[in-house]
Curated annotation (Swiss-Prot):
Part of a Scar/WAVE complex containing brk1, scrA, abiA, pirA and napA. It comes from Nematostella vectensis. The gene is napA. GO terms for biological process: cell adhesion; cell migration; cell morphogenesis; cell projection assembly; cortical actin cytoskeleton organization; neuron projection morphogenesis. Belongs to the HEM-1/HEM-2 family. This is Nck-associated protein 1 homolog. GO terms for cellular component: SCAR complex. Keywords: Cell adhesion. PANTHER family: MEMBRANE-ASSOCIATED PROTEIN HEM, NCK-ASSOCIATED PROTEIN 1. It holds the Pfam family Nckap1. Involved in regulation of actin and microtubule organization. Involved in cell adhesion.
């Protein structure tokens, strides 16, 4: 430095500011290089290339003097461009660090030459910047020495550069020497700091009182009520005051680093009185300090190694050993501090939430509380995540704090409070600056009689800038920028702290005190986020992911701490604050890490809530099931057995019977049941989930409630499906009424979540149950619609034909013979099918109907094949049905008549079941949406039949469970069987009716065709033929344009003729003859096209009357 430069030309303030900012950037870059070189996945490939291994060994051995013509280096020749491209970022980072070191050394020398006086209580910003530069330089050089591949990287790059350009890279000689010098960074730095020890010692001595005050125990804090804003109610509105506000929220760990590194670099000062005590006190606080992020410095070991071997430092080494031995006491001290902070910060949060106007006057206390909480959290993290020295009787569990989540939550609460009321703070401190501060500043400036022009201009600018402020600027949303004011104050500190300056800062403490407060107030206007980050940034957890996740898991499992687990995803929003503009490439990795962490935490919280809720729902369902009528007999048996049970000694042994609802009677409030514990856990967890509506993390917004909603949807969907208990192998499924009852019980339990979380459970139910009406849900999994459709069609309807199950129109259900283990009525009566309609909804019932229609279409397709096979005979029968002899002969020529009748019965059974589910759906919808159903009914009845949109109306009505003359689903299913020529199609389906008509008498020869009056059904379900004939005829005629009434009249005529021939066979014992006669009446009664007049014109009514009389006289074995 030239001695001719004036104090203003030296620009000490500007240089300190720039170098500190650049030093942080250099630390970030060297940190990433160290991590990259230590990780095999990110390590430069050249360093692991087997072909380059001899070259690298040679470079490391000869570094920095290497012979470029050495044979070991020939392998680099072919890849010199790739080496330079791959290692240039690494190399020039070291070059930048060397330049930073040179600039920092030059500035420290200039400061010494100017005899700058440092005092943290006088020129805080200048002193802090000076000490920060010393610590940053020390940490940077230690980090350089920790990069294991530094010699190989630098030497390899320089050799490739020299091979390409014919000369060494210009910075390499100095860079190589720096690498050699700083292999032992502490000793080298101590040598360099010999000229600076006077300035360093002066700055550090001003910290002694502050460090002692900040190192008090938790009990001393509690007695002093240092964080209480209501300890003096009369002064609750009085602003927090301090001569140097920034000192109040200056962290102990920062002071500790200043003291440790400062005095150790200037170890000659340790012999001076008072300095040793403060240095030893710092050494007793744990066993490590933070260098940068998760890089720590084991100071006992490192300082011991540094001083070992130096003459006259045996006593200092003994002090280090004593401090290490007393380290265990710090664990209890920090634990006591955290206990106090939890209660103090919680109290502060509650008061400020009730009275946010106190944020302004008590902001200094808030920042103080956040800073010491932040300090304690960082101390705990670095000591938990780094193993203690083996010689110390400490384990990692000694440092672990199960109540850490509570402290993290308290910090986050205070942060969110400050951020929420940002405008309140701005209004308060703008008024403070433009009122009290500027008034006092004018008076203080007037007292200064002698000052240079530069200083006069700076102080005048202070007054002008503060005088121009007004609250209207806050109301209009104007952005404030006080960075220039703060930099001018730093310049003023530098100008007036130099020996011989006029005026000297130490002679104007009123100005110092006032400007320190002005700077503090200005930061709370334009740098609120930065100030909060300074005292409460928890981005350190980004670099301790294992500890972060482990703490979260423990918090989630601890019922007393689970309400605070929301702090962990909130902390993920801090991660991006640790990034640096000097290393933009790390933004995406850190951002991705923050996103994955917050997603993991919120997902785990939602899953835990879901798991607890599933257990609660299971217990509620069990309690609900105790009220089912199926459990009534067992309950009565258990009640009776209480009175009869005795042991061998004739002593009464009561088997305690617990009736439903007994759990509601409590003997004491203290006794918690398992359900109580689960509900308590759920309440605590839901409190965490609902703590905030949104969590911003790296340009993303996360909504905790949405995670819970998605988990509840997934859980509810799986629960509904599991309630069906569908067993494919054993072909079993739960009764729809039981499933519906369980679903309603679960919905009732889930609905209680609204009391805890405000989650819209109605949306969850609608979303899940709507998906359950489809064959597959959004995840592609089978739903209850698919399961019940498969079971009813592939299992139940098959059993109808094979196990003797009968459709009873009288009971409106399918029933089976007594003694069978399977009860068809339990799945097909009115209550069950209405329950099925509620579960499947209109969409699900339509899907079930479509699948039934496909089965009918399959049967009709087979019938069509049989008709075509017998086409010639059927054509002849159609024209000669009134000629007995010819007709009998033609009937004998027909093939597969029994097959035709069986398929018609199958179709009829499917259609009968279809009718039952349609009636159930209609009943349910009339209860649920009566207005809409009345509109559909009116439209179905009054919409013109000739209109082109009539089919749409019928489809709507059918989907709502209403009966139409022609089923549109059946029409659509049979449309695929239509012939190209309508004449051929009409003929084919007309012949099918002829086939059925002449085949009906064959049923009279089967005993299974007898009619059961109690069920109003035939034992072989022959009565279902009436449904199949009417429905198929209507659908086929609708598709091909034929007249269904003509076809049915023809069918009636042929059937009547065929059945009347049975009466002439008196010599044969046809038990089912009268039962078959009834089929004709059923066809007419169910047909929308035929009337009894038409029937009487071709079949005597007397025969029907006698047939009904005959079948109802018979007594059949009852069906159950």
């Amino acid at each position: 430095m030239e001695r001719g430069l004036s104090v203003t030309e030296q620009k000490l303030a500007e240089k300190l500011t720039i170098l500190n900012e650049r030093g942080e950037g250099m630390l970030t870059r060297i940190y990433n290089i160290k991590k990259a070189c230590s990780d095999p996945k990110s390590r430069p490939g050249f360093l692991m290339d087997k072909a380059l291994e001899p070259s690298i060994k040679y470079i490391v051995r000869k570094f920095p003097q290497m012979d470029t013509k050495a044979t070991q280096l020939q392998a680099v020749q072919s890849i010199q461009n790739e080496v330079m491209k791959g290692l240039s970022n690494y190399y020039f980072t070291f070059v930048d660090i060397m330049e930073f070191k040179d600039n920092a050394s030059e500035l420290l020398t200039a400061i010494d030459a100017s005899f700058v006086h440092f005092d943290i209580t006088l020129n805080f910003d200048l002193t802090k910047a000076y000490l920060d530069l010393i610590v940053t330089l020390t940490a940077l050089m230690i980090m350089v020495s920790r990069v294991d591949d530094r010699r190989s990287v630098l030497g390899l790059f320089n050799h490739a550069f020299e091979m390409r350009n014919g000369r060494s890279e210009e910075s390499f000689p100095r860079l190589g020497q720096m690498i050699l010098d700083y292999d032992s960074p502490l000793k080298k730095l101590a040598e360099q700091f010999v000229p600076h020890q006077q300035r360093v010692s002066t700055a550090l001595q001003s910290l002694h009182e502050i460090y002692l005050r900040k190192s008090m125990t938790g009990e001393q804090w509690r007695q002093g009520q240092i964080l209480s804003i209501i300890n003096a109610p009369a002064n609750i509105l009085v602003p927090g005051q301090s001569k140097v506000p920034a000192v109040e929220y200056l962290e102990v760990s920062v002071i500790q680093r200043w003291i440790m590194f400062g005095y150790t670099m200037c170890h000659q000062q340790l012999a001076m009185p008072g300095i040793t005590d403060i240095w030893k006190m710092a050494l007793q606080d744990g066993f490590c300090i933070t260098l940068f992020r998760d890089e720590i410095f084991m100071f006992h070991k490192e300082f011991h190694n540094m001083l070992d071997g130096m003459k006259g430092y045996g006593k200092r080494i003994k002090d280090i050993q004593d401090a290490a031995n007393q380290m265990a006491a710090s664990v209890g001290i920090h634990k006591e501090r955290r206990n106090y902070l939890r209660s103090a910060l919680t109290e502060m949060t509650l008061i400020l939430a009730d009275q946010p106007g106190l944020l302004g006057p008590k902001m200094l206390i808030i920042l103080h509380g956040l800073s010491i909480a932040h300090d304690e959290i960082l101390w705990l993290v670095r000591h938990c995540c780094n193993p203690a020295p083996r010689s110390r009787k400490l384990t990692q569990e000694d440092f672990f704090d199960s109540k850490l989540p509570h402290l993290l939550f308290a910090v986050e609460e205070l942060r969110s409070m400050v951020q929420k009321y940002s405008s309140v703070l701005q209004r308060y401190f703008i008024q403070y600056l433009s009122g009290f501060d500027v008034y006092m500043l004018k008076q203080v400036v007037q007292k200064i009689s002698i000052c240079s022009e530069d200083i006069s201009l700076i102080m005048t600018s202070f007054i002008d800038e503060l005088s121009s402020l007004s609250v209207k600027q806050v109301e209009s949303g104007e952005l404030f920028h006080f960075s220039g004011l703060r930099l001018d104050w730093l310049r003023l500190q530098a100008y007036t702290s130099v020996r011989g300056s006029s005026p000297e800062l130490k002679d104007n403490r009123d100005l110092v005190e006032l400007m320190n407060n002005v700077v503090f107030h200005s930061k709370l206007v334009d740098l609120q986020d930065e100030t909060l980050a300074e005292v409460s940034d928890l981005s350190i957890f980004c670099f301790y992911p294992g500890f972060f996740e482990e703490s979260f898991v423990r918090c989630l499992e601890d019922i007393t701490q689970s309400r605070y687990c929301i702090a962990f995803p909130l902390i993920c929003g801090h991660f991006m604050t640790c990034t640096s503009d000097f290393c933009p490439e790390e933004r995406h990795p850190i951002g991705d890490r923050s996103l994955s962490a917050v997603n993991l935490f919120l997902d785990s919280m939602a899953k835990e809530a879901r798991n607890i809720m599933s257990q609660v729902c299971s217990e509620h369902i069990q309690q609900h099931q105790q009220l089912w009528h199926t459990h009534a007999v067992r309950m009565m048996t258990e009640m009776a057995s209480e009175r009869r049970t005795k042991d061998k000694n004739k002593k009464n042994v009561h088997v305690e019977f617990k009736p439903p609802g007994i759990e509601s009677f409590r003997k004491s409030r203290e006794t918690l049941t398992s359900l109580d514990t689960k509900l308590l856990s759920l309440t605590e967890l839901c409190h965490a989930i609902t703590h905030t509506e949104a969590i911003p993390v790296w340009e993303h917004i996360f909504a905790p409630k949405e995670y819970l909603s998605s988990q509840l949807e997934e859980f509810f969907a799986k629960a509904v499906v599991s309630m069906a208990q569908y067993d494919i192998d054993n072909q079993r499924i739960a009764r729809p009424s039981e499933v519906l009852s369980n679903v309603k019980a679960m919905m009732s339990s889930l609905r209680s979540l609204e009391n805890y979380t405000g989650v819209d459970t109605a949306r969850v139910f609608n979303h899940v149950l709507l998906q359950q009406t489809q064959p597959q849900d959004s995840q592609g999994a089978n739903t209850i619609t698919q399961m019940y459709t498969t079971w009813y069609l592939d299992v139940f309807l098959r059993r109808v034909m094979t196990d003797g199950i009968v459709y009873s129109p009288r009971r409106m259900a399918f029933v089976n013979r007594p003694g069978m283990p399977f009860r068809a009525e339990e799945y097909t009566d009115v209550n069950e099918l209405q329950a099925l309609a509620e579960l499947l909804g209109a969409y699900g019932m339509r899907y079930l109907g479509e699948k039934m229609m496909l089965q009918i279409a399959s049967q009709v397709s087979e019938l069509k094949k049989l008709v075509i096979m017998n086409k010639d005979v059927l054509v002849a029968l159609r024209t000669n049905f009134d000629k007995p002899e010819q007709c009998i002969e033609l009937i004998r020529r027909l093939r597969n008549m029994d097959d035709v009748m069986l398929r018609m019965i199958i179709i009829g059974v499917i259609l009968s079941f279809r009718q039952l589910i349609q009636q159930a759906l209609d009943s349910v919808l009339k209860t649920r949406v009566p207005y809409m159903m009345s509109c559909i009914t009116d439209m179905r009845k009054n919409f013109p039949h000739g209109n082109n949109d009539r089919q749409v109306v019928d489809e709507m009505a059918t989907s709502a469970g209403q009966e139409c003359v022609v089923d549109p689903l059946l029409c659509a299913a049979l449309r695929t069987l239509k012939e190209k020529k309508s004449e051929d199609d009409i003929l084919t389906w007309s012949l099918l009716l002829v086939f059925v008509a002449v085949g009906l008498p064959s049923l009279a020869y089967k005993d299974a065709s007898e009619y059961n009056g109690e069920l109003e059904a035939h034992d072989n379900n022959a009565h279902c033929i009436s449904s199949s004939v009417n429905s198929i005829t209507g659908a086929l005629c609708s598709n091909n344009g034929d007249n269904p009434e003509d076809r049915l009249r023809e069918f009636l005529a042929i059937t009547s003729s065929s059945l009347l021939k049975l009466g002439m066979e008196a010599e044969k014992d046809l038990k089912a003859r009268e039962s078959v006669y009834l089929l004709l009446d059923m066809v007419v009664q169910q047909s929308p096209y035929l009337t009894m007049d038409v029937l009487e014109s071709c079949f005597p009514y007397a025969l029907l009357r006698n047939a009904y009389h005959e079948v109802y006289q018979k007594r059949k074995e009852p069906f159950l």
